[in-house]
Amino acid sequence: MEDANHDSVASAHSAAFKKSENLEGKSVKIEGYDFNQGVNYSKLLQSFASNGFQASNLGDAIEVVNHMLDWSLADEAPVDDCSEEERDPKFRESVKCKVFLGFTSNLISSGVRDTIRYLVQHHMVDVIVTTTGGIEEDLIKGRSIKCLAPTFKGDFALPGAQLRSKGLNRIGNLLVPNDNYCKFEDWIIPILDKMLEEQISEKILWTPSKLIGRLGREINDESSYLYWAFKNNIPVFCPGLTDGSLGDMLYFHSFRNPGLIVDVVQDIRAVNGEAVHAAPRKTGMIILGGGLPKHHICNANMMRNGADYAVFINTAEEFDGSDSGARPDEAISWGKISGSAKTVKVHCDATIAFPLLVAETFAAKREKERKSC
């Protein structure tokens, strides 16, 4: 009996104190930021990589984006069949990664609009894909449409029926006065009228991206990311153009002044072409939220056998099979991301994660370049 007990205890001891593989030098040691150093936000963000959980994923995302921004063709050896221009060291140094930025409309409703405007203003991204709300919400907030009110902070728990009686629309904990859309109609309908005239007189065939570019020109407002996209010749694609207030405007306009044509086929050629003809550049994807912008950017990059960098920031899960929640590895299976790509998904509200990521990547890089001038 005593021998049996001894064997049981020995077995339990062996189970409890199983010998470990030595991880020293193989894995990052978990440690957080020491505030005894003082408050240094850059070092705080850098510490996220060793913090664990989603802080580490955000730290990894910062690293991936910095790789994306630092890459140049000079990092690669010239291929045998490249052109003479591509052999020139100065040319190779000038060739940078093409950055695709995708985001859902709620982020333009939020203060992330100003972060996105900063990136577009300074031409830090090359291609944008968003939803219809990501177009109209930017225009509605434009200061040049002086009669329009801003979006306001509310509460997630405000009763829908009560808000409806007051003409207030809720987006999470944001409130948008319905008058905004009434005044948006007053602003946009004359522009659609003019576009129809030009379609007839100048034989212009409008596409969603051309329409969006025109609206960016018309808003003429430095607080608008669409204004800067127009000014910097950055294409903004919106394949679901009719799914929002802008679609409502097109619907009502089709009765008041029928005939305007918006061709989506030209735009699918254009957005896919942005990826297909990116070579010899690498491509990187930064996608906030899921749905249409996420898939549209990934699918375009499939046409070139996958993007080289990918950062997804969203709170969706993969277990219902939705594309929104799919991790980068699923996109690799479709050829939308290269098998050798640097990728990460940050499971986090983009209103928290994205400004922090921009602070330690795009903005930090620009500030460093500005100080070195």
From Swiss-Prot:
One molecular function GO term is:
deoxyhypusine synthase activity
Which coenzyme or cofactor does it need? NAD(+)
* A GO CC term attached to the entry: cytoplasm
Which SUPFAM superfamilies does this entry report, sorted A to Z?
A: DHS-like NAD/FAD-binding domain
Q: Which residues form the active site?
A: 336
Q: Which InterPro entries match?
A: Deoxyhypusine_synthase, Deoxyhypusine_synthase_sf, DHS-like_NAD/FAD-binding_dom
* UniProt entry tagged with the keyword Iron: no
Pathway where it operates: Protein modification; eIF5A hypusination
Q: Which domain of life is it from?
A: Eukaryota
Q: Which Pfam families does its entry note?
A: DS (PF01916)
Q: Tell me yes or no: is Signal among this UniProt entry's keywords.
A: no
Arranged from A to Z, the UniProt key words for this protein are: Hypusine biosynthesis, NAD, Transferase
Q: What class of enzyme is it?
A: transferase
Q: What is its EC number?
A: 2.5.1.46
Quote the catalytic activity from the record.
[eIF5A protein]-L-lysine + spermidine = [eIF5A protein]-deoxyhypusine + propane-1,3-diamine
- Sites binding spermidine sit at 136-137, 248, 295, 321-323, 330-336
Residues holding NAD(+)? 105-109, 131-133, 137, 243, 290, 315-316, 349-350
Q: Which family, according to the similarity comment?
A: Belongs to the deoxyhypusine synthase family.
- Free-text function comment from the UniProt entry: Catalyzes the NAD-dependent oxidative cleavage of spermidine and the subsequent transfer of the butylamine moiety of spermidine to the epsilon-amino group of a specific lysine residue of the eIF-5A precursor protein to form the intermediate deoxyhypusine residue. Also able to produce homospermidine from putrescine.
User: Which PANTHER family does this entry report, sorted A to Z?
Assistant: DEOXYHYPUSINE SYNTHASE
Its recorded name reads Deoxyhypusine synthase
Q: Its gene?
A: DHS
